[in-house]
Each structure stands twice: as structure tokens, then as C-alpha cells.
């Protein structure tokens, strides 16, 4: 049985808004009996999340993208997109899970990167290392949403598994909000693999002259149209990025 406990609640000023940062500890009785430590998960909340179905993003930790700004993935841009959009709407939740590398951990993720440098895609690399394609489990995120007493929400995601996890918990998704961000020459293959082999709902993204500048400036609010959950994926648009000085 899973028990969720809030252990901290602080104000977190950001460039977009002052969020409340909640820290949770989850004790799974089965894992506790085996001596495993309690899992932790974070949630950033903003505004009154019960006046209307709030915008919610379930986001997995990515040290390479979010700390070192790696261009191999879209994690950094998706995190900023979610926080900025929540701030623009005035209310919302971002659940931040510690599931680095789709659940295989940082070191194994870097080993997978080595194989990708040799030509394998993200799926082939995981399988070569003996890992599942995606080891993540969203039960902890769902428990956070239940703790926050959310019965309906707008879910920002391109991942059908997150949609299924939320719906299976009996939480209504009134709208899927696209988590598309501009591709770059380093992330194009990765995003195409997510679309074509993992079934992610990656649709076309508008072109910008400089991907690096897109999230460094105050861009216009994204079109949050009434995206259907079964939105068909479309073509990715590559961006030219300036060469780095060495």
C-alpha cells in the first residue's frame, strides 16, 4: 500500500511566477519491508487549482537537459514551456518525478548515449543495455494529483502512457495540451523516434530563427487549442542553431 506524506511547502520565486514547491515522501509498504528507502516527488503549484480544471504537467527529471542544457532531448524546453504556460494561465501544477533517463538512472542513460553516438536510436540503446524501453511508473504522480484533490485537469503531454495513467486513476482529462517544442539538429532523431516508435503525439512545431533564443525571451503564449487526445503526429521542423565556440 502506498502512503503519501507532504514533508515541505515553500515559496519558490521563478522568472515566471512565485510557485509553491511541495515535497512529498511516499512509503510503499512492500518496498519498505524489503529495506528500500522512501521515494520522493516534488510538485510546483500556482494559484487556485480548483476553480477550473488546471493545467498539469507530469515531468521526469533530466539532469543532462535541465542542468547542462543538452540539446539531445526536449526536456529543458518542455519544463520551461510548462512553467511559463502555467504562469500565463494563472493556475496549474507541475509534478516533478525523479525518473532520470526514462527510469534507468543517470549513469545508464549516459551509457545509452554512448550507443546512440554509435548509431542506435534511444529504444535500441536501452534494449542493448538490457533495460525496458521505458521503465517509468506514474503511480506516484497520480497520488500527488489525488493528494491535491484534482478530479479534472488539462494535461500537458505528448505521451499516451501519461494520459492512460491519469485516466486509469479516475481523473478526467478535459483537454490534452501539446508539449511540443522546436526540434534542433541534435534532437531531431530522438523526437522522430518518440513519434514513430513510441507513439508520442509529437506534432508539427513552428519554426524559430534560433532555438537557443526561444526560451530566453518572453515569447507569445502558445496556441493551446482544443487538442484531441488522439491528435495525429505530423512533421518536425528542424532549426538552425549557431555553432558553438570552442
Name each model feature, range by range:
Residues 1-224, 230-246:
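Catalytic domains of riboflavin
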Amino acid at each position: 500500500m502506498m502512503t503519501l506524506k507532504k514533508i515541505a511547502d515553500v515559496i519558490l520565486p521563478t522568472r515566471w511566477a512565485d510557485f509553491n514547491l511541495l515535497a512529498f515522501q511516499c512509503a510503499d509498504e512492500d518496498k519498505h519491508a524489503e529495506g528500500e528507502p522512501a521515494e520522493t516527488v516534488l510538485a510546483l503549484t500556482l494559484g487556485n487549482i480548483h476553480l477550473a480544471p488546471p493545467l498539469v504537467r507530469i515531468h521526469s527529471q533530466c539532469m543532462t537537459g535541465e542542468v547542462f542544457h543538452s540539446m539531445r532531448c526536449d526536456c529543458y524546453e518542455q519544463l520551461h514551456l510548462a512553467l511559463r504556460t502555467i504562469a500565463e494561465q494563472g493556475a496549474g501544477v507541475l509534478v516533478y518525478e525523479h525518473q532520470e533517463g526514462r527510469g534507468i538512472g543517470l549513469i545508464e542513460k549516459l551509457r545509452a548515449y554512448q550507443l546512440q553516438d554509435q548509431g542506435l536510436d534511444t529504444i535500441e540503446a536501452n534494449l542493448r543495455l538490457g533495460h525496458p524501453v521505458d521503465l517509468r511508473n506514474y503511480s506516484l504522480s497520480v497520488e500527488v494529483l489525488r493528494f491535491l484533490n484534482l478530479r479534472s485537469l488539462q494535461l500537458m503531454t505528448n505521451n499516451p502512457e501519461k494520459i492512460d495513467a491519469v485516466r486509469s486513476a479516475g481523473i478526467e482529462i478535459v483537454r490534452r495540451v501539446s508539449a511540443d517544442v522546436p526540434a534542433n539538429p541534435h534532437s531531431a532523431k530522438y523526437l522522430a523516434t518518440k513519434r514513430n516508435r513510441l507513439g508520442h503525439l509529437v506534432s508539427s512545431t513552428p519554426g524559430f530563427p534560433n532555438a537557443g533564443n526561444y526560451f530566453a525571451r518572453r515569447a507569445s503564449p502558445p496556441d493551446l487549442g482544443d487538442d484531441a487526445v488522439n491528435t495525429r503526429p505530423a512533421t518536425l521542423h528542424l532549426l538552425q542553431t549557431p555553432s558553438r565556440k570552442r
